[in-house]
Amino acid sequence: MAFGIRRAYPTPIVKPLWPYAVGGVITFFLFAKAANASMNTEEFINDPRNPRFKAGGVKEEH
């Protein structure tokens, strides 16, 4: 018995799992879009943690 030699089986890996990969990519982009929409609301636009605020792209309203 040769334990170091593995036999190659024709097991499909990508074919049954492609819907999960596509769903993951779609979910990632939808969450990114929702996060960007949330960052640009009036409530969070002047938050110092907002990247646009740090870059100086937002005027402070007094």
Curated annotation (Swiss-Prot):
Cellular component annotations (GO), alphabetically ordered: mitochondrial inner membrane; proton-transporting ATP synthase complex
Pfam families: ATP-synt_J
Range of residues in the leader sequence: none
Membrane-spanning parts: 13-32
rRNA-binding is among the record's keywords: no
GO MF annotations in UniProt: proton-transporting ATP synthase activity, rotational mechanism
GO terms of biological process kind: mitochondrial proton-transporting ATP synthase complex assembly; proton motive force-driven ATP synthesis
Superkingdom in the source lineage: Eukaryota
Keyword Transferase: no
Topological relation to the membrane, as annotated: Single-pass membrane protein
Keyword entries, A-Z: ATP synthesis, CF(0), Hydrogen ion transport, Ion transport, Membrane, Mitochondrion, Mitochondrion inner membrane, Transmembrane, Transmembrane helix, Transport
Cellular localisation: Mitochondrion inner membrane
Task performed by this protein: Mitochondrial membrane ATP synthase (F(1)F(0) ATP synthase or Complex V) produces ATP from ADP in the presence of a proton gradient across the membrane which is generated by electron transport complexes of the respiratory chain. F-type ATP synthases consist of two structural domains, F(1) - containing the extramembraneous catalytic core, and F(0) - containing the membrane proton channel, linked together by a central stalk and a peripheral stalk.
Family assignment from sequence similarity: Belongs to the ATPase j subunit family.
Known partners and oligomeric status: F-type ATP synthases have 2 components, the catalytic core F(1) and the membrane-embedded component F(0), linked together by a central stalk and a peripheral stalk. The central stalk, also called rotor shaft, is often seen as part of F(1). The peripheral stalk is seen as part of F(0). F(0) contains the membrane channel next to the rotor. F-type ATP synthases form dimers but each monomer functions independently in ATP generation.
Protein name, UniProt field: ATP synthase subunit J, mitochondrial
Organism field: Yarrowia lipolytica (strain CLIB 122 / E 150) (Yeast)
